Amino acid sequence: MLACIEICPEEWSNRLMITELWVSDNLQLQGIGTHLMNLAKEKAKEQGRRVIILETQSCNVVAISFYRSQGFKLIGFDSCCYTNRDVERHEVRFDLGFFLDNSSQAIKP
């Protein structure tokens, strides 16, 4: 596999969750991740979703930088998602969100 994105609708909250985004190391920085994100954004708009959400780890600086470049903002964190020592281990779960234009909280990238 060279790249993939997995999305999951949350009906009760009208959100679209990105549960997996992966691009092979040798194909990174070629626009593939951006293309996959644009597909997710298009799907979210088609479905009338209000926000796209995803999670990453505080130690994954490359992913955080990429998501921010795609217009995602920090919307929360969980300091004990993985272990009871997440903060000590510098591996806190970050929740990020991209608000769609049809939302009253629209954020333009």
Placement of each model-derived feature along the sequence:
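Alpha-helix C-cap/termination motif
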Residues: 10, 46-47
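Alpha-helical transmembrane segments of multi-pass integral membrane proteins
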Residues: 44, 53-56
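Short alpha-helical
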Residues: 13, 61-62
